[in-house]
């Protein structure tokens, strides 16, 4: 087994040597390519006016500045060429025309075939986003992964850059950023749940209380049942009349309801006549009979009547 591993590990050495030889071959190929460029068999393009002018100027500038790079010399020569007037460019343009005519005469079958230069873009140049969203070298995510605070800071910076890129205002976007930033902290989830519990408790208690009052109103055969539907705009009156009936029952009731029954019972006398005359079967009876019905309703509300059914429910004889 170790022998097999040794035999498997040995070949990379010669391969590296062969790779170096391949590199040497590539170097030789490049050298041959350079030789082909400089070879007399290769037909060059005729020089244009700028090349005719820059041929002497380049040599002169290279002698004056021996440490200057060729690309910098080309930039300066191009800037100087643009500053020249047409009269100064004219002799070089004429010389370029003469060289072109001579080139066409010597090489009638010549056709310029430009070779496409493939520009290899770097990774960060390919995927860079506007506004500097990615840090140089792609280290923004790597620096923020270790610590949660660092990740939140990197996210906030990127969100700010997104906000400026999309044209959002700082005020409106900061609210959204705060909403997104709160759940990042692990301790805030339990705190948020603890804050949400009292609200749910209040809602459930209110629902239970409403269901209790509605069920008690439905079970009692009293004018409260008709009054709760006749006048929905006065919930205090309905609550007060219901409290008086619940007080007469044997079951326990909330103390708030009983206190409201004493405070709001006098307000009901004026409106009971209209409601009873509207919803009771004897509504067609003339007006003098209404006080008797009002007295009967108040008698039922005051206390339990002997001979009634279980739990103090009121009889329906007045119907």
Curated annotation (Swiss-Prot):
Sumoylation inhibits binding on DNA and negatively regulates the FGF4 transactivation. GO terms for cellular component: chromatin; cytoplasm; nucleoplasm; nucleus; transcription regulator complex. A motif (9aaTAD) lies at residues 274-282. It is found in: Nucleus; Cytoplasm. Residues 1-43, 247-267, 299-319 are annotated as: Disordered. GO terms for molecular function: chromatin binding; chromatin DNA binding; DNA binding; DNA-binding transcription factor activity; DNA-binding transcription factor activity, RNA polymerase II-specific; DNA-binding transcription factor binding; RNA polymerase II cis-regulatory region sequence-specific DNA binding; RNA polymerase II-specific DNA-binding transcription factor binding. Disruption phenotype: Embryonically lethal. Expressed in the cochlea (at protein level). Expressed in the brain and retina. A very low level of expression is seen in the stomach and lung. Expressed in the kidney. Keywords: Activator, Cytoplasm, Developmental protein, DNA-binding, Isopeptide bond, Methylation, Nucleus, Phosphoprotein, Transcription, Transcription regulation, Ubl conjugation. Residues 43-111 bind DNA. GO terms for biological process: adenohypophysis development; anatomical structure formation involved in morphogenesis; cell fate commitment; cell fate specification; cellular response to cadmium ion; cerebral cortex development; detection of mechanical stimulus involved in equilibrioception; detection of mechanical stimulus involved in sensory perception of sound. The modification Phosphoserine is found at residue 253. Its main location: nucleus. Induction: By SRRT. InterPro entries: HMG_box_dom, HMG_box_dom_sf, SOX_fam, SRY-related_HMG-box_TF-like. The modification N6-methyllysine is found at residues 44, 119. POU5F1/OCT4, SOX2, MYC/c-Myc and KLF4 are the four Yamanaka factors. When combined, these factors are sufficient to reprogram differentiated cells to an embryonic-like state designated iPS (induced pluripotent stem) cells. iPS cells exhibit the morphology and growth properties of ES cells and express ES cell marker genes. There is a cross-link at residue 247 (Glycyl lysine isopeptide (Lys-Gly) (interchain with G-Cter in SUMO)). Residues 248-263 have a biased composition (Low complexity). The 9aaTAD motif is a transactivation domain present in a large number of yeast and animal transcription factors. Transcription factor that forms a trimeric complex with POU5F1 (OCT3/4) on DNA and controls the expression of a number of genes involved in embryonic development such as YES1, FGF4, UTF1 and ZFP206. Binds to the proximal enhancer region of NANOG. Critical for early embryogenesis and for embryonic stem cell pluripotency. Downstream SRRT target that mediates the promotion of neural stem cell self-renewal. Keeps neural cells undifferentiated by counteracting the activity of proneural proteins and suppresses neuronal differentiation. May function as a switch in neuronal development. Interacts with ZSCAN10. Interacts with SOX3 and FGFR1. Interacts with GLIS1. Interacts with POU5F1; binds synergistically with POU5F1 to DNA. Interacts with DDX56. Interacts with L3MBTL3 and DCAF5. The interaction with L3MBTL3 and DCAF5 requires methylation at Lys-44 and is necessary to target SOX2 for ubiquitination by the CRL4-DCAF5 E3 ubiquitin ligase complex. Interacts with RCOR1/CoREST. Interacts with PHF20L1. The interaction with PHF20L1 requires methylation at Lys-44 and Lys-119 and protects SOX2 from degradation. Interacts with TRIM26; this interaction prevents ubiquitination by WWP2. This is Transcription factor SOX-2. It comes from Mus musculus.
